From Swiss-Prot:
Gene Ontology BP, a term: cell division
Chief place where the protein resides: nucleus
Protein name from the UniProt record: Centromere/kinetochore protein zw10 homolog
Summary of subunit composition and partner proteins: Component of the RZZ complex composed of rod-1, czw-1 and zwl-1.
Organism: Caenorhabditis elegans
UniProt similarity note: Belongs to the ZW10 family.
Lineage of the species this protein comes from: Eukaryota, Metazoa, Ecdysozoa, Nematoda, Chromadorea
Amino acid sequence: MASSEGSYRDLEKKLKNGLTSISQDIVDKYGNLKVSLNVNATAKLIFDRLENLEDIAEMSTRNLSNLIDQTAKDSPEMLAEIKSQAQSCENLVEFLQSMKNVEEQLIIMRSKTTNRVEWGTAILACKDFLNDTNMLLEGIGRDGFDMSVPLKHFAAEYSVLSYNCRYQLSADYERAMNVPKLSKQKCGDRTNVSFSVFNVGSVEDQKMLNETLSAMNMIGQLPERLDAWKIVILNVFCEAIVASRDGVDVYIVDNPTPDQTRFLINQKPRGKKDKTIDVAKVLESMEVFFTKLHSVLHSHELLDATGKTFTSMIGSVIEEQLITMILKDVIAIAAPVTETADEDQEMFINLLQIGEVFVERMKELGFFSQKAKLLFTLDTDTIFVTRRCFAIVSKANKLINETYDKLVTVGVDDSAIKDIDLLAKAHTHAEHFAKEYGKDLGRLWSHNEDSQFPSFFAFQKCTVSESTINFVNLLRDNVKAAFACEDEGARAKLALTAENIVRLYVILTPRKHAELFSSIPNMAAIFYNNCHYISHCIMTMSFEASGDNQKTLLEPLLLDSVIRLRTVAADCMEKTLTRCRREMTAYLEDHSIFEHLPASYKTTKNTFAAAEEMSESADILVPREEPKIIKCLAACLLHIRLIAKNLREPLTEVVYCKVIGSLVSFLLDSLVRHVVTTSDFRENDANVMADVFKRLLEVVANIVAYKEQTKVTDFCAREYFRLNEIVFVLGNRMQDIEHRWFNAKGPMAEHLSRSEVVGLIKALFADSQHRSDLIARL
């Protein structure tokens, strides 16, 4: 047993002494940096000692194996400890092997080898071995072997040598090609950017450059250089070629020295942005550029497992973006885009063919992969539908931005049949013609033919802008195209485009013409008509198209767009009316105009009359000073008349009467609120106001009129009759007021509340028993 334990202790001592010696050598070499040390000789010494210690550790492992067998027979209680020491030896062997691998790679990185691929391999391998050694360090540390200090020196040495190797590789690369590193952000003037490629003299130099490129690719340096190539080629040279519109005199390729080829942007002024783009010349200029670039780079290739050429590496980073640039910035701009997508199809295909020729040439030069296609996986039908939708939206945007200088009258005229049974008759009529037309009921409503039902779904006569007529025609053609489309995806795109252009109209028009609508009420009325005309046409479009998918396509348009259009129309008109009310409020907010009126003042026919309605009577020939209340009310009526004059022609009968009725209602309601909130009236003021208000009611009855028929009781009945009852109260006795009230059953009770009547009586008549009795009886 003593012999076994002595053998174990002897092995343990040898391992610790060996590790201590190696650790000191590593510290002297990498940590203390002793000048007297011969680096290469010391490195060889450390490597030899690591090998010797590895042999000792392996021998120890074998001896411990024999010791385990002997201990199992002689002393079973020591078996667990011996097995633990055997495992420690195995861990140490693995750690020493990893350290030896690290030192071996450091020797390669430190050597002056001309094979740059060995550098790249050593950098990657050394990093992996260092990671493995770090993972094993904790295990041997638990067994009493501390190697953390020498391992830190290994890591520091790797960092220095790796930096030196990377720097040397970068220097070799820069001697072969000088490409500036530019920001990806497109800022500043890049017309002075250039890059150079230097010719490689001998076969040996070419081999060394290829090894350099391979090593840089292995350690991750090449992708950064490829990004620099990508920015210079695409963002500088290709963009300049596209911006020139014809590719003429965009760049210069020269040889400042016999072994240098330089590419630089021509400083001469190029074409303007609005110049027509020539696809053939632009792509020809690009082809010449890449051909010359290929001529100076064709011999550069990688010597790793990929075997790629340097041109293919550049092509891999520019291929997708360059193809997108050709499609988007060259072909798409040159090809005409129309709403029908039929006119541009032939020319677009021709331009695509020119682009495909360029792609094939790039494949020959090695910049594009063999799988590269100009259109990727897209088919031409999808492209044409997308372009058509883009054209529809562009045309709609142009129509929305047009001013309302050209106006058109739409809707049925005044001679249209008006019959309460029109709907039932039209339904019977439709059933009759359904037998003749079959499923083509759209002919009954076609805008291109005389309608069979001029009053069914009739749109009242009004004025809209010509741009709106064109907008509706564009929308109608779009919807019909969606119905006629057989492809489900294309049909959905066209239907969505129809919905989108209506939303664009709703959102953009109030913003684009906001100043116009706020300053000219007539234009606000035109916009109101435009919105309702579009809504009407959207509803009738369902009769102009037929098919099983009719409901699916039209339902979103009907449910969403019609509501949006009517809402924005109402908002615009309400803003106009709000401004009008605000201006009238400025005249009526001074309550002093209702007080201290001239004694026995009487209005005449010319009071509140329009200028064209005034007669040459005595009060015109001899002008008199009118009280302030007359001037303020006349100003309000003048404002309403001006609005009415501007809106009578464009608006429909109903809308016109509602708009003017709203303004008149506001005026009358303002007067009513003033009277019912006044606590005391002078007798003369009450009599004059009764006369003034009576004359005012006569005038507004003529203002809220259409076709010489007053509509005041239809559109502002509440305010009109309330003021009429107040006129009665102001100009009559208490007994007459009681009779008109008639126990809350008379005409006065229909329009005025008891509290309002009581308040008027208290303000008009002095406090007396008779007044108290009357109030009690109300």
